[in-house]
């Protein structure tokens, strides 16, 4: 069977699949179908990752196309559409009819994974990162805070929860995560467990340790609703090492030697005596993809001929590589069998800050039930000032896995990285798991099918880590170095090293307990913010973008003798519907309260002017007098007045500028208000032809269309016009 990109449908949707035309012809398969063969038992033929379909079993049906059983993803059902290669169809046209339109909304983390797997989904690349939940034993709490602080400054909404808050059992922790998922704003998209399984428990599935069940919140299936990783450490010293690795990898990457950013290492072990020959072809495929993506050096250590891999692997890792990708057939919890490389060899590395991501697609090496397993050794190696080993490790805990699933998993991880441009570690490795599901949607057994592999492979590391795929570039960032208390607007300009604007850079402003704003730069490299600065302190400014070294700066918020600015406002729409909101066609009375945030000087002869360049707003009464405002005091005036266009859209943001003048100085404040309007989405249509509900050639039918008001205002006196864009269809009554 061939699985198309997945279809994403809500639980209320229905769909119809129709073969419009087809040419029936026998197809000569290049290689036979693979059986479920356990590594390292004889397979008998080579499977190229270019043809994953041939690793799949036929559906057992003569139907050329089928819909597989759904699984749940967030608020939607996910259906695989399966084409059966043994049905004898060489060419076909496939039409998929949706009886209900769905505006699909996925958080940034899941959107990365599914953007090229779902037919009816349009990816929005600037969705902001959301929640990060760190769960830690009480004894590790203080050691975790530097990581939480860095992530917070980057723009994440970080919560650090002690086991004394979550509960100490796996069930209690899962319940805590579930509650956060449903009730927090924003909900966590990433979860970091801090400690080995003796510190933070895991689940056991098919007798193997796994963290995957923590991620399955919605539905009765095995798909993740969020991403998880474990900093599997045994003590505070190990934890300090791992956190130092993560922070420095993201914030201050090693650039004394930049060649390591474009080097990787492929390690594979075939077993020709058992005719297990797929690992090396799989690694050659991944190697080719790296080279095609601009990597100039992709080392290989293959068995045969290399049996003892210590020297070759050590030399490559010490030179510096960004990824180490192993695919083999025999391993143990302490390392790879062929080419051999074990825990003691990891300890002997000296790669310092040139830390790779290790993906170990083989049995046992990620079994964190052992102490320490191979993956834990890579993660913990070194110390905070002289690290070595890896930044993260992705591997399996069970003692047995199968080649045809492992090959798909390996392929999917690096397809996600190199083709789909998935750079966050949790989504990148989960893309590998989804490749397993895409190729085996009908084989989902928890003991041997897709579900088994979702549980089998776990991430030892930070799932929110953004990996490097090129030599880091540098920003030039411009912003005010100091601002007075009371300032409520702040602009950041982001340029590259050639002084050209950088579009799409994420800018985070963070002032403890007061300001947390995240935005993206526009085509001019500018990000504008409305902020709160009621007290003196440091406003941290952090700018990030993939393959740019983060800018970590700040502006000092200082007291001033006198500073008058926006404090609060009230809206009156008594001449409209009197709901206290800005709606189409209304006249708004806007009362703005100003405050003197200064600490010593009275502001006199204060006046303010309200302006906007918004095409939907006309300010008709724009200038107001406020008189005298003493330090720390507030003052009101009569309302400003503006008219709202009938054509304003729902959730449209109106940007006002408040120019304040006085005998002492002039200032500017920002004010942003949202409008509410009716907004209608197409939902579904019904073809009332008295027959099969399908509009067919020569047929005249009634058409009923259902719409939904997804806006913030009741819609009244609605009218609709129907037009046909198909020359073969005429609308009689429009």
Feature locations, PLM:
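Short edge beta-strand/loop segments characteristic of extracellular beta-sandwich folds
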Residues: 491-497, 591-595, 704-708
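Sec-dependent N-terminal signal peptides
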Residues: 2-10
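Cysteine-dependent hydrolase recognition
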Residues: 11-551
């Amino acid at each position: 069977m061939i699985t198309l990109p997945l279809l994403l449908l809500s639980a209320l949707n229905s769909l119809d699949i129709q073969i419009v035309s087809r040419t029936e012809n026998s197809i000569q398969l290049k290689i036979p179908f693979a059986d479920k063969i356990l590594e390292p038992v004889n397979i008998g033929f080579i499977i190229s990752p270019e043809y994953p379909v041939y690793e799949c079993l036929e559906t057992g049906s003569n139907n050329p196309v089928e819909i597989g059983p759904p699984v749940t993803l967030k608020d939607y059902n996910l259906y695989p559409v399966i084409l059966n290669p043994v049905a004898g169809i060489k060419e076909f046209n496939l039409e998929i009819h949706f009886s209900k339109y769905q505006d699909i909304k996925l958080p940034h983390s899941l959107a990365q994974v599914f953007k090229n797997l779902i037919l009816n989904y349009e990816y929005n690349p600037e969705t902001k990162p959301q929640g990060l939940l760190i769960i830690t034993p009480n004894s590790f709490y203080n050691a975790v805070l530097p990581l939480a602080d860095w992530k917070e400054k980057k723009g994440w909404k970080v919560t650090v929860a002690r086991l004394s808050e979550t509960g100490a059992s796996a069930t209690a922790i899962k319940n805590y995560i579930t509650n956060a998922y449903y009730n927090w704003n924003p909900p966590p998209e990433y979860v970091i467990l801090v400690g080995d399984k003796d510190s933070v428990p895991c689940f056991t599935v098919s007798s193997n340790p796994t963290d995957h069940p923590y991620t399955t919140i919605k539905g009765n299936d095995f798909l993740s609703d969020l991403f998880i990783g474990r900093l599997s450490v045994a003590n505070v010293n190990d934890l300090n090492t791992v956190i130092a690795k993560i922070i420095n990898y993201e914030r201050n990457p090693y650039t004394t030697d930049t060649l390591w950013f474009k080097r990787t290492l492929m390690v594979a072990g075939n077993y020709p005596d058992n005719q297990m020959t797929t690992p090396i072809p799989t690694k050659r495929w991944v190697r080719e993809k790296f080279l095609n993506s601009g990597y100039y050096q992709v080392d290989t250590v293959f068995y045969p001929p290399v049996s003892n891999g210590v020297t070759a692997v050590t030399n490559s890792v010490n030179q510096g590589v960004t990824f180490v990708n192993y695919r083999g057939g025999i391993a143990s919890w302490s390392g790879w069998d062929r080419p051999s490389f074990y825990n003691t060899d990891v300890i002997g590395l000296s790669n310092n800050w040139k830390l790779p991501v290790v993906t170990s697609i083989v049995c046992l090496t990620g079994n964190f039930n052992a102490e320490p397993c191979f993956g834990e050794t890579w993660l913990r190696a070194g110390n905070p000032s002289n690290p070595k080993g890896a930044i993260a490790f992705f591997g399996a805990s069970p003692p047995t896995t199968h080649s045809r699933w492992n090959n798909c998993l390996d392929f999917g991880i690096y397809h996600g990285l190199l083709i789909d441009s998935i750079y966050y570690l949790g989504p990148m490795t989960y893309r590998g798991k989804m490749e397993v599901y895409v190729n085996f949607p009908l084989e989902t057994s928890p003991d041997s099918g897709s579900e088994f592999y979702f549980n089998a492979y776990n991430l030892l590391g930070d799932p929110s880590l953004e990996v490097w795929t090129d030599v880091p570039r540098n920003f030039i960032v411009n912003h005010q170095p100091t601002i007075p208390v009371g300032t409520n607007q702040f602009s950041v300009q982001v340029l590259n090293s050639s002084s050209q604007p950088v579009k799409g850079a994420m800018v985070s402003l963070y002032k403890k307990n007061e300001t947390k704003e995240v935005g993206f730069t526009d085509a001019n490299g500018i990000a504008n913010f409305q902020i709160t600065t009621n007290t003196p302190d440091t406003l941290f400014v952090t700018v990030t973008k993939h393959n740019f070294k983060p800018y970590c700066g700040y502006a000092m918020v200082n007291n001033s003798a006198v500073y008058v600015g926006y404090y609060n406002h009230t809206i009156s729409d008594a001449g409209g519907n009197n709901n206290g909101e800005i709606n189409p066609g209304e006249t708004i009375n806007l009362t703005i309260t100003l405050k003197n945030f200064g600490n010593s000087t009275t502001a006199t002869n204060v006046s303010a002017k309200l302006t906007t360049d918004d095409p939907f707003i006309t300010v008709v009464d724009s200038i107001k007098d406020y008189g005298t405002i003493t330090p720390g005091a507030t003052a009101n005036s009569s309302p400003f007045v503006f008219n709202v266009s009938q054509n304003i859209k729902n959730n449209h943001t109106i940007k006002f500028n408040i120019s304040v003048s006085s005998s002492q100085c002039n200032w500017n404040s920002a004010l942003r208000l949202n409008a509410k309007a009716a907004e209608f989405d197409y939902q579904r249509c019904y073809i009332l032809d008295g027959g099969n509900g399908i509009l067919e050639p020569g047929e005249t039918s009634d058409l009923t269309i259902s719409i939904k008001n997804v806006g913030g205002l009741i819609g009244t006196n609605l009218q609709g016009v129907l037009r046909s864009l198909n020359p073969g269809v005429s609308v009689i009554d429009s």
